[in-house]
Amino acid sequence: MSDNITDLEPTAERPNVRKVFVKTYGCQMNVYDSQRMADSLAAEGYVATDTPDDADLVLLNTCHIREKASEKLYSALGRLRKMKDAREANGKELTIGVAGCVAQAEGQEILRRAPNVDLVIGPQTYHRLPNALARVRSGEKVVETEYALEDKFEHLPSPKREETRKRGVSAFLTVQEGCDKFCTFCVVPYTRGSEVSRSVKQIVAEAERLADSGVRELTLLGQNVNAWHGAGDDGREWGLGELLFRLARIPGIARLRYTTSHPRDMDDSLIAAHRDLRQLMPYLHLPVQSGSDRILKAMNRRHKADEYVRLIERIREVRPDLALSGDFIVGFPGETDQDFEDTMRLVRDVNYAQAYSFKYSPRPGTPGADLDDHVEEAVKDERLQRLQALLSEQQYAFQDSMIGREMDVLLEKPGRVAGQMVGRSPWLLPVIIDDSNDRVGDIIHVKITSTGTNSLIAQKLA
């Protein structure tokens, strides 16, 4: 557990300061949440460190989507228990906190299974983190998972400009949380709550602050991001499409993305944004989970497979260069060979640039956990292997199709060798450019010459 994967840069050494190590598991929103928790702690005098070995506070921001994520948490807590015992033997302290969706789902159970934990705090209450830590210092074991009545975003401090600059030229911005879809396999409605949209005023203010700190690309986040809605500047009710047009007017913001979407919430205004908004990148993550109508109904997805395919056709009609990403679950209870073949057919019909696929694992508290007719693990394994082979074939074909193409690339960081830069293509793929004297944050025109492992190799054009 030596990696800090939250994009929190360690701060220069200062004597007698409290240090925090944040470990993030799971989705992009957890990365965003970790950054905001770090901002709260910075306001209390904590500085980030890139190792738990010298941290005064270790905070694990957790994911509950799959069973393995919970197992990772308890394995990490076992290692931290030994570290905490060693500290106490030398008269020193280590505070251990668990945040995120496992914290929300399990609460007091975490303290029972891991008594070395001092603090459990959910994703809707992390604005109370400084107060919770004060209670821990007074000797209390704290579980803070009740859904807050107040808007947490109104109570979170903004990071200092130099801290935002250290995080890079691409940034996440949460605009929506929670989900009301209640897919039978999913824990999100139970760990993140009902759908809540942040106000246009809040979102624009945060986006302007990020742009002022040098951010060029914004990715809007939500568990069901295209369900976002709110009162617009013009007095009308806006959807995500209108919000994207508003954010595109902010000076300095050159690129926009959003994730994760639900097919039922892809409305006309959002499709129009893909057609008309040059800042909106031609990349869409739109999960379908299965190509079988019978399984989609059992999952409570509220759409059919052919409706999903027709939706993709509509978007590609207005944005022919769109690259599509998706999510798939194999082995959902009752999935037959024919159901799986329907999924394979949908994948062939849609042709994905990238996709994520998993074996179904029942999550406690979800309707899917109570279903009978579970698929044997060996069958799940075989289906997953076949699906991933097809998706990999499509992914490599998409990357190969980039060879010879010209495109604009946003430079994000120096490469591993002198003179090399790493950027991001409009289709989200990393692009490696040799012999570049450009700066991070520049957008340069390149020609793709070859492909690497999940990356593109390019030559800068004059």
Curated annotation (Swiss-Prot):
Listed EC numbers: 2.8.4.3
Major location category of this protein: cytoplasm
UniProt domain TRAM: residue ranges: 400-462
Keywords, alphabetical: 4Fe-4S, Cytoplasm, Iron, Iron-sulfur, Metal-binding, S-adenosyl-L-methionine, Transferase, tRNA processing
MF terms in GO: 4 iron, 4 sulfur cluster binding; metal ion binding; N6-isopentenyladenosine methylthiotransferase activity
Binding site for [4Fe-4S] cluster 2: 179, 183, 186
Record flagged with keyword Iron: yes
Chain ranges of the MTTase N-terminal domain: 18-138
Domain Radical SAM core: 165-397
Subcellular location as annotated: Cytoplasm
InterPro entries listed in its UniProt record: Elp3/MiaA/NifB-like_rSAM (IPR006638), Methylthiotransferase (IPR005839), Methylthiotransferase_CS (IPR020612), Methylthiotransferase_N (IPR013848), Methylthiotransferase_N_sf (IPR038135), MiaB_methiolase (IPR006463), rSAM (IPR007197), rSAM_horseshoe (IPR023404)
Gene Ontology annotations for the cellular component aspect, listed alphabetically: cytosol
Enzyme category, top tier: transferase
Enzymatic reactions: N(6)-dimethylallyladenosine(37) in tRNA + (sulfur carrier)-SH + AH2 + 2 S-adenosyl-L-methionine = 2-methylsulfanyl-N(6)-dimethylallyladenosine(37) in tRNA + (sulfur carrier)-H + 5'-deoxyadenosine + L-methionine + A + S-adenosyl-L-homocysteine + 2 H(+)
UniProt-listed Pfam families: Radical_SAM, TRAM, UPF0004
Residues given in the record as [4Fe-4S] cluster 1 binding sites: 27, 63, 101
Purpose: Catalyzes the methylthiolation of N6-(dimethylallyl)adenosine (i(6)A), leading to the formation of 2-methylthio-N6-(dimethylallyl)adenosine (ms(2)i(6)A) at position 37 in tRNAs that read codons beginning with uridine.
Family per similarity comment: Belongs to the methylthiotransferase family. MiaB subfamily.
Protein name: tRNA-2-methylthio-N(6)-dimethylallyladenosine synthase
Organism: Brucella anthropi (strain ATCC 49188 / DSM 6882 / CCUG 24695 / JCM 21032 / LMG 3331 / NBRC 15819 / NCTC 12168 / Alc 37)
